[in-house]
């Protein structure tokens, strides 16, 4: 039987070989190619699967290590918080449990990192080592963990803020022996931890955590101070916004703020019409050249000049003693233009000279013109009693009297518009003015109210005795005028009475309406107009965002905007429409 089976197996193998040999070469090559393609596809699928698994493993390892770093960071913060609370309240049982929990996990983490449970590990050093070891992996594929880079930067900045000594222990800021090398060692801590991340595990047992409460408190204050300095350094341009305007972020805004003044010099320095010379001035250097009056502000100067004939009025206006704004004595140059060395307006002693040899109120002054004011007009112009006495005394001794000129005729307004009711006496005194006015009124009233008697006394006697009847006669022109005048006076009085009543009613009605409007205005909210105002920073953003920014005349644009600037508690603001017009003009 065994021989039969062996013979059958040999026959079957021989038959297969015979069938394979019977295939043509083309069919044989196709089968070989199919087998190779199948094997290649299998290997590729296997490799892709392995790579995917490896990537997942790497991701999980990174997540685990980052979680460990974050957990240790939170534990350190919790420890600092507990120690900080000791200063404000006594320690409780819960605080003690928290500290024991932190110590236990800190020791376990140190044992896992070193391969044994001996020695305590510095938490800050472990943070640096973990961040350095993860830096290479995270940098290879940053798309996997987008938050890893941010966490690593935060941890590095947290570790850099601490002061380390040579052995890696935390040093209080008040320790003078090690504070001199704190900055250099802190800068080298990061550099040394990154390249030696593999060998740092052997030195972790030498680093110990300093748990002294006093040193931790000092360290916390130092961390807060350094954090403020770092935040201030990262604010952009390094400007101290607490001491200066927040709009001083560029030279453009600094110049534009001069329109409203700065904190150092709050006086506006915008361009004004005073910087331009007045019409009719010349720039030559002769004796009639304009006098330059320096203002206390600095650069602003006012150029004024008299005419070629030396007009006394213009010289008076351009007198430095007259326009001076200082309380000091006048300089010799100023005395040359003044009358007798008298102090000008704003200078000490100006009020004393006002009653004496004043350049404005003296009859000999160029500004005094009797032909314009009139000789008897002086007392009505200057109402001060002291000035009136002085002027009257000077008029008696120096002025020329014209007996045929009455100032009341030239200026009837000062006599209450009674020009047409005055008497023909032009030389009355001021004291008799009221009496003359009363007499003139009586004469006029008698004239308008008294009937004109007849010239024929006999006719009047006959009519009075009843012997002759009075015939109706035509009204004379004078009688007609008198009646019309009386009617007009009566009608005007009635009209005034009615108008006064209407005005009283209207005033009462207007008062009631005003009260109603006031009540409505109390509940009305005034809309804000700040939406249309742009600050300097917003204007500067518009300028710098323009593609033709390099071709813009910044100085010209700033000067144009200064003329339209408005002042607010936040600095300079400009209307958005004005800004857009100026930008279109300079960017076209």
Swiss-Prot record:
Region described as Basic motif: 28-51
Segments for region (c-CRD): 536-567
GO molecular function terms attached to this record: DNA-binding transcription activator activity, RNA polymerase II-specific; DNA-binding transcription factor activity; transcription cis-regulatory region binding
Sequence motif Nuclear export signal, residues: 552-559
UniProt-annotated stretches for the region Transcription activation 2: 376-477
Biological role: Transcription factor that plays a critical role in response to various stresses and reduces the stress through transcriptional activation of its target genes including multidrug transporter FLR1.
Domain remarks in the Swiss-Prot or TrEMBL record: Contains two cysteine rich domains (CRD), referred to as the N- and C-terminal CRD's, n-CRD and c-CRD, respectively. A nuclear export signal is embedded in the c-CRD, with which the nuclear export protein CRM1/exportin 1 interacts only in the absence of disulfide bonds (or otherwise oxidized cysteines) within the c-CRD or between the c-CRD and the n-CRD.
UniProt name for this protein: bZip transcription factor GAP1
Organism in which the protein naturally occurs: Candida glabrata (strain ATCC 2001 / BCRC 20586 / JCM 3761 / NBRC 0622 / NRRL Y-65 / CBS 138) (Yeast)
GN (gene name): AP1
């Amino acid at each position: 039987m065994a021989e039969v089976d062996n013979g059958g197996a040999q026959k079957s193998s021989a038959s297969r070989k015979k069938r394979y040999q019977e295939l043509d070469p083309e069919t044989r090559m196709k089968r070989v190619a199919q087998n190779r393609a199948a094997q290649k596809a299998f290997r590729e699928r296997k490799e892709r699967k392995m790579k995917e698994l490896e990537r997942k493993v790497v991701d999980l390892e990174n997540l685990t290590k980052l979680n460990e770093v974050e957990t240790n960071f939170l534990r350190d913060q919790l420890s600092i918080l507990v120690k900080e609370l000791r200063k404000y309240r006594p320690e409780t049982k819960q605080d003690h449990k928290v500290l024991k929990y932190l110590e236990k996990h800190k020791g376990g983490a140190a044992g896992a990192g070193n391969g044994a449970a001996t020695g305590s590990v510095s938490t800050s050093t472990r943070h640096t080592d973990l961040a350095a070891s993860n830096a290479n992996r995270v940098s290879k594929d940053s798309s996997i963990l987008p938050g890893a880079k941010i966490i690593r930067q935060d941890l590095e900045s947290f570790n850099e803020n601490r002061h380390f000594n040579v052995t890696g222990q935390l040093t209080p800021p008040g320790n003078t022996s090690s504070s001199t090398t704190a900055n250099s060692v802190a800068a080298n801590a990061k550099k040394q931890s990154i390249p030696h991340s593999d060998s740092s595990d052997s030195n972790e047992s030498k680093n110990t955590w300093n748990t002294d409460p006093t040193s931790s408190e000092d360290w916390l204050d130092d961390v807060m101070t350094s954090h403020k300095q770092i935040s201030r350094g990262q604010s952009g341009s390094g400007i101290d916004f607490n001491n200066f305007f927040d709009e001083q972020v560029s030279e453009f805004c600094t110049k534009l703020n001069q329109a409203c003044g700065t904190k150092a010099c709050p006086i506006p320095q915008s361009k004004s019409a005073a910087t331009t010379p007045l019409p009719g001035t010349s720039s030559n250097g002769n004796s009639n050249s304009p006098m330059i009056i320096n203002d206390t502000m600095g650069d602003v100067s006012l150029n004024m000049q008299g005419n070629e004939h030396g007009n006394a009025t213009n010289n008076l206006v351009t007198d430095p003693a007259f326009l001076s704004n200082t309380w000091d004595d006048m300089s010799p140059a100023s005395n040359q233009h003044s009358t007798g060395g008298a102090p000008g307006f704003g200078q000490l002693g100006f009020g004393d000279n006002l009653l004496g040899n004043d350049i404005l109120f003296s009859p000999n002054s160029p500004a005094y013109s009797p032909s314009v004011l009139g000789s008897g007009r002086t007392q009505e112009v200057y109402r001060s009693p002291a000035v009136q006495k002085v002027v009257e005394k000077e008029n008696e001794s120096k002025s020329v009297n014209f007996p045929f000129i009455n100032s009341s005729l030239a200026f009837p307004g000062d006599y209450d518009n009674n020009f047409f009711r005055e008497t023909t006496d032009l030389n009355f005194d001021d004291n008799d003015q009221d009496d003359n006015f009363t007499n003139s009124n009586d004469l006029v009233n008698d004239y308008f109210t008294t009937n004109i008697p007849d010239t024929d006394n006999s006719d009047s006697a006959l009519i009075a005795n009843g012997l002759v009847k009075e015939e109706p006669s035509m009204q004379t022109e004078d009688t007609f005028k008198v009646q019309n005048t009386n009617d007009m006076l009566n009608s005007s009085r009635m009209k005034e009475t009615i108008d006064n009543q209407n005005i009283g009613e209207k005033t009462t009605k207007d008062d009631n309406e005003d009260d109603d409007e006031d009540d409505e205005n109390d509940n009305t909210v005034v809309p804000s107009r700040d939406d249309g105002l742009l600050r300097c920073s917003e204007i500067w953003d518009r300028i710098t965002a323009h593609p033709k920014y390099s071709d813009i005349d910044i100085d010209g644009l700033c000067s144009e905007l200064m003329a339209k600037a408005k002042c607010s508690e936040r600095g300079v603001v400009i209307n958005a429409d004005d800004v857009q017009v100026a930008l279109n003009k300079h960017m076209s």
